[in-house]
């Protein structure tokens, strides 16, 4: 009845790998079968959600709120598909950049007015005022309208790795102001730099992959470079080895994306 493409999602937490976009009805049936019968996502896929497929530009809004005031961090866009050219399965994120070139102050005000403030008002009306981080995954449709694809109450990965380096204020002071209910007085300058991050993943991710491979890292002292560890650990000999699907995020900071 829904037609294709559609979106099939696991109803539980699946480390960013629980969303599928089948192009045909047959693929949709196959994915549902793998999740419900073969339990490819374990308990996370015990129940599924079927959603409309929405076209447009997807982006991430990270914001801090003390329950009354919202402060939006620099915009970001992550890339979830495993392969180049926006191909392959969805992942927890294979890379990101910040800020998004086509996002301006007018757009941010629109997000605050249309998405964030109504959300906070709704929470207050439900008797659950919220203080903390809001992650809104937003699709900007070709006509400029907004669809909220997901909400989280945490920073994103890899979005945080590119947003925080270009954030012009003191993030610790911002969190402190949030906890004190004084966020309305917290200001910071516009980003003057851009950040681009690329995830280094284990072969086979997000499907079956092996771990325990020894790795070495060079370039940690390069100016304008950050290397964030994720799926790494030390073996009994003290060697750095892989321990997960997404192993490292390498971030470069510069004056422009070019």
Please tell me what each predicted stretch does:
Residues 1-18:
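A conserved helix-loop-beta module that forms one wall/lid of the active-site cleft
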Residues 3, 222-237:
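Short amphipathic beta-strand starts and helix->beta connectors
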Residues 11, 18-161:
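Internal nucleotide-binding/catalytic subdomain
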Residues 16-18, 196, 244-250:
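Short amphipathic alpha-helical segments
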Residues 83-85, 185-187, 232-240:
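Short beta-strand/turn micro-motifs at beta-sheet edges
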Residues 112-134, 152-222, 235:
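Active-site "cap" helix and flanking loop/linker of ATP-utilizing ligase/carboxylase catalytic domains
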């Amino acid at each position: 009845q829904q037609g294709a493409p559609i979106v099939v999602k696991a109803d539980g937490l699946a480390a960013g790998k629980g969303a599928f976009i089948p192009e045909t009805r047959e693929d949709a049936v196959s994915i549902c079968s793998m999740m419900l019968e073969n339990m490819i996502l374990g308990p996370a896929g015990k129940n599924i959600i079927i959603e409309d497929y929405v076209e447009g530009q997807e982006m991430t809004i990270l914001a801090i709120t003390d329950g009354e005031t919202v402060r939006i961090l620099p915009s970001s866009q992550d890339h979830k598909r495993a392969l180049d050219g926006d191909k392959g399965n969805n992942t927890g994120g294979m890379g990101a950049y910040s800020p998004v070139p086509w996002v301006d102050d007018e757009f941010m005000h629109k997000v605050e007015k249309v998405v964030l403030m109504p959300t906070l008002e709704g929470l207050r009306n439900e008797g659950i005022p919220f203080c903390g981080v809001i992650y809104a995954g937003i699709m900007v449709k070709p006509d400029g309208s907004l669809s909220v694809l997901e909400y989280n109450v945490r920073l994103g990965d890899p979005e945080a790795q590119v947003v925080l380096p270009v954030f012009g204020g003191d993030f610790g002071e911002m969190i402190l102001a949030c906890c004190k209910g004084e966020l309305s007085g917290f200001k910071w300058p516009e980003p003057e730099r851009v950040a681009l991050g690329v995830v280094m993943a284990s072969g086979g991710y997000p499907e079956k992959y092996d771990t325990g491979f020894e790795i070495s890292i060079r370039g940690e002292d390069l100016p304008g470079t950050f290397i964030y560890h994720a799926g790494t650990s030390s073996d009994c000999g003290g060697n750095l080895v892989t321990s997960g699907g997404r192993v490292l995020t390498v971030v470069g900071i510069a004056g422009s994306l070019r």
